Amino acid sequence: MNKLMSIITIGIVLFSTSCKDDEINLVSVEQNATITDQSVTEAYFNEAGDLSIQAFNTPTPNEIAGGRTNGTITITVEGDTRFNGAIVTLTTSGNDPLNPEGTITIDFGDGQTDPRGVVRKGIIIVNYKGLRFVPGSKTITTFDNYEVNGVGIEGTRTITTSSFSVTPALSVSFLVKDVDGKATFSDQTTITRNATHSHTITFGNTPGSTTWTVEGQASGKTRTEVEYIFLIERPLIFKTECVFKGFSMPSEGEALFTIGNLPVGLNYGDEGAACDNVVTVSINNGTQNITVNN
């Protein structure tokens, strides 16, 4: 499940944006830059949240609870090359094994480069409280001089388990909130972000039949100080079937990305749509299909 979350959360990007040369470009250079910047910000915040969940899911229940005594241990996140070179530590602070508390730090130091060429610097700090997947348990993620490819990330992401069900299928739901989020680019311009989403993972009988549903909205200001809202109008559906085929975008769902007073509709696919990386963009009474780069 952790690998699924890694792939899917990165795929939440709005559309990171290059059109084919033979397509009519309905989006201005400025609008395209705004959409691209928002895509980067969305991706980096979701990845940071995923890294925190990955780290939280790695220790044993006894290590999370601290055993009989509190202390600090170093943990290793297996199978995820994004953690290459990072030092991950777990410090427990609570004294109730049924309601454990502690802090996980993911320290990339002065810079670590993963096999895909992504450079991460600084520290992700994950404070947790409660047993994994138990309703009410949560992780609170903050940052200490954290950067991805030169883009600084700030803010607080809180992930709270809202429900756990075994019928009609095994599923876990989370409430995800971003508060005072900010991405700072190399020219010191920023994108701000506040967001509230609900995430639900529904596990199928086979690895390729698991789905991930995302609802909610994000809002803030662009690098040019224009207000924006990204509202999911029809739940975004991610499928492991599609991920395994190399398609990281949602296979279904719609969103409205409003930049200032300009509404931009995004359609990722209707119910039962085939796996692809095509987004239908609606703008100024016209539509255009854009193929997204993974």
What kind of region is each of these model predictions?
Residues F15-S18:
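C-terminal motif of bacterial Sec signal peptides marking the signal peptidase cleavage site
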